């Protein structure tokens, strides 16, 4: 007789305990313990011998298949790899399903046989969305199913005719082996594990769409990200028309690469002039505004940094940062006060990265400092200038990685003044190297 036992599993770290608690004892997260029913009547099956292979470099490049979406190829490291499992997460309505449907209906250079499986929509709804997106490739197979065994059986029935499988989404898939509802930790873990193993054994590419939590993390157990080969996040603000696809894990390419897309009525469109998308053309510079020459992955990207400083009557003036680390803003303010005498203790300070972008590059310190100095002194920054450089606690400006790539992107977009840390082997007339914040202050004056 089958024996089912209740366990309590942390939805954050998948730690299993015998009783419920408000906080996970393993990872410390509150409110993450959920009840699961696990079948304990499983017999141990003896394994069989496997054949060893040797590590060699004669793998065919045909294993990587470029997609018709160039921005997606950049993020993936050149294209889709046969037998790989890819997880793509994002907020509801951000465009995950639209991107995946456009991908499956694209015309690949090498003939790709694609299957789009939905657990959230009916077949008629998928067809209506395809009409809205002007998709004319009607050879794409679609299937509405939520049962794992049915999905694998359907793929097996057409195994020789399927190269790419999209499942939208993994939270809706369930297996008959478990009695727990869809979206629970055990269901997600078991179904994802079976699908990943199936893709490896049959050399099929599987793309899994995934929900995210209110904190922007992949919904479900953390092991889900460990199972797959690639983890992508589709980022963006519903109030803005652009979207960014970013890689957080990639066994076949670089991590941190981004692809820039634009959301339109006819679907998702690639953006090639990505830097121009986030910049506003002005005849004269505005007080408190600077341009940061950044790097996202291997891609140079120019971004606008805006600062606003106003007097405050509060005991503790407000410090707000949108798209930038608030703790790092406090550090830059302390360095400006200590090293160049710019005391802003009685002022409210607002910092924003234009376009809803988020910057984690330490080289953005110099652009932020320039915007703050400009806003505090009401002096516009030099026209057609860009900034990059990391600021230390001593006020020194440290060297920055990929400086030449940043400079080339700035020059290409018409900027003729680069204010940055001191560089080696780069001595152009338009480069103004700074060793300390005091030199930056003199340039702004």
UniProtKB/Swiss-Prot annotation:
<keyword id="KW-0378">Hydrolase</keyword>
<keyword id="KW-0547">Nucleotide-binding</keyword>
<dbReference type="Pfam" id="PF13541">
    <property type="entry name" value="ChlI"/>
</dbReference>
<keyword id="KW-0067">ATP-binding</keyword>
<dbReference type="GO" id="GO:0005524">
    <property type="term" value="F:ATP binding"/>
</dbReference>
<dbReference type="GO" id="GO:0005829">
    <property type="term" value="C:cytosol"/>
</dbReference>
<dbReference type="Pfam" id="PF06745">
    <property type="entry name" value="ATPase"/>
</dbReference>
<keyword id="KW-0234">DNA repair</keyword>
<keyword id="KW-0862">Zinc</keyword>
<protein>
    <recommendedName>
        <fullName>DNA repair protein RadA</fullName>
        <ecNumber>3.6.4.-</ecNumber>
    </recommendedName>
</protein>
<dbReference type="InterPro" id="IPR020588">
    <property type="entry name" value="RecA_ATP-bd"/>
</dbReference>
<dbReference type="InterPro" id="IPR020568">
    <property type="entry name" value="Ribosomal_Su5_D2-typ_SF"/>
</dbReference>
<keyword id="KW-0346">Stress response</keyword>
<dbReference type="GO" id="GO:0003684">
    <property type="term" value="F:damaged DNA binding"/>
</dbReference>
<keyword id="KW-0479">Metal-binding</keyword>
<dbReference type="GO" id="GO:0140664">
    <property type="term" value="F:ATP-dependent DNA damage sensor activity"/>
</dbReference>
<dbReference type="GO" id="GO:0000725">
    <property type="term" value="P:recombinational repair"/>
</dbReference>
<dbReference type="InterPro" id="IPR014774">
    <property type="entry name" value="KaiC-like_dom"/>
</dbReference>
<feature type="region of interest" description="Lon-protease-like">
    <location>
        <begin position="348"/>
        <end position="445"/>
    </location>
</feature>
<dbReference type="InterPro" id="IPR004504">
    <property type="entry name" value="DNA_repair_RadA"/>
</dbReference>
<keyword id="KW-0238">DNA-binding</keyword>
<feature type="binding site">
    <location>
        <begin position="90"/>
        <end position="97"/>
    </location>
    <ligand>
        <name>ATP</name>
    </ligand>
</feature>
<dbReference type="InterPro" id="IPR003593">
    <property type="entry name" value="AAA+_ATPase"/>
</dbReference>
<dbReference type="GO" id="GO:0016887">
    <property type="term" value="F:ATP hydrolysis activity"/>
</dbReference>
<keyword id="KW-0863">Zinc-finger</keyword>
<comment type="similarity">
    <text>Belongs to the RecA family. RadA subfamily.</text>
</comment>
<dbReference type="Pfam" id="PF18073">
    <property type="entry name" value="Zn_ribbon_LapB"/>
</dbReference>
<feature type="zinc finger region" description="C4-type">
    <location>
        <begin position="10"/>
        <end position="27"/>
    </location>
</feature>
<keyword id="KW-0227">DNA damage</keyword>
<dbReference type="InterPro" id="IPR014721">
    <property type="entry name" value="Ribsml_uS5_D2-typ_fold_subgr"/>
</dbReference>
<feature type="short sequence motif" description="RadA KNRFG motif">
    <location>
        <begin position="249"/>
        <end position="253"/>
    </location>
</feature>
<dbReference type="InterPro" id="IPR041166">
    <property type="entry name" value="Rubredoxin_2"/>
</dbReference>
<dbReference type="InterPro" id="IPR027417">
    <property type="entry name" value="P-loop_NTPase"/>
</dbReference>
<comment type="function">
    <text>DNA-dependent ATPase involved in processing of recombination intermediates, plays a role in repairing DNA breaks. Stimulates the branch migration of RecA-mediated strand transfer reactions, allowing the 3' invading strand to extend heteroduplex DNA faster. Binds ssDNA in the presence of ADP but not other nucleotides, has ATPase activity that is stimulated by ssDNA and various branched DNA structures, but inhibited by SSB. Does not have RecA's homology-searching function.</text>
</comment>
<dbReference type="GO" id="GO:0008270">
    <property type="term" value="F:zinc ion binding"/>
</dbReference>
């Amino acid at each position: 007789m089958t024996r089912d036992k209740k366990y309590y599993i942390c939805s954050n770290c998948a730690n299993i305990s015998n009783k419920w608690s408000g906080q996970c004892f393993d990872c410390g997260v509150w409110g993450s313990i959920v009840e699961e029913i696990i079948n304990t009547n499983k017999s141990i099956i003896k394994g069989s011998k496997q054949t060893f292979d040797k590590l060699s470099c004669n793998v065919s490049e045909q294993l990587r298949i470029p997609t018709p979406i160039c921005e997606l190829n950049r993020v993936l490291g050149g294209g889709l790899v046969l037998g790989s499992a890819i997880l793509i997460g994002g907020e509801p309505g951000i465009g995950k399903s639209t991107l995946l449907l456009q991908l499956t209906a694209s015309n690949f250079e090498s003939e790709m046989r694609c299957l789009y499986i939905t657990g959230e929509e009916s077949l008629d709804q998928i067809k209506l969305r395809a009409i809205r997106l002007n998709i004319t490739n009607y050879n794409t197979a679609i299937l509405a199913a939520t049962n794992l065994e049915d999905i694998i059986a359907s793929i097996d029935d057409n195994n020789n005719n399927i190269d790419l499988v999209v499942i939208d989404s993994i939270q809706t898939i369930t297996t008959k082996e478990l009695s727990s509802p869809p979206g629970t930790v055990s269901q997600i873990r078991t179904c994802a594990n079976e699908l990943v193993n199936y893709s490896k054994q049959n050399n099929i590419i599987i793309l899994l769409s995934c929900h995210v939590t209110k904190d922007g993390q992949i919904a479900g157990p953390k092991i889900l990200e460990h199972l797959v080969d690639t983890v992508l996040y589709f980022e963006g603000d519903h109030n803005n028309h652009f979207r960014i696809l970013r890689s957080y894990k990639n066994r076949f390419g670089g991590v941190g690469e981004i692809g820039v897309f634009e959301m339109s009525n006819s679907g998702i469109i690639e953006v090639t002039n990505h830097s121009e998308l986030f910049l506003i053309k002005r005849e004269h510079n505005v007080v408190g505004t600077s341009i940061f020459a950044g790097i996202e992955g291997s891609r140079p990207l120019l971004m606008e940094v805006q600062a606003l400083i106003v007097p405050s009557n509060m005991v503790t003036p407000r410090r707000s940062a949108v798209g930038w680390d608030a703790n790092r803003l406090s550090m830059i303010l302390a360095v400006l006060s200590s090293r160049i005498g710019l005391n802003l203790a009685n002022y409210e300070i607002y910092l924003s990265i234009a376009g809803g972008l988020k910057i984690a590059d330490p080289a953005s310190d110099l652009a932020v400092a320039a915007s703050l100095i400009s806003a505090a002194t009401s002096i516009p920054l030099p026209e057609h200038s860009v900034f990059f450089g990391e600021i230390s606690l001593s006020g020194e400006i440290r060297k920055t990685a990929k400086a030449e790539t940043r400079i080339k992107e700035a020059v290409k977009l018409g900027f003729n003044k680069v204010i940055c840390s001191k560089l080696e082997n780069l001595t152009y007339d338009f480069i103004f190297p700074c060793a300390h914040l005091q030199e930056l202050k003199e340039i702004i004056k």
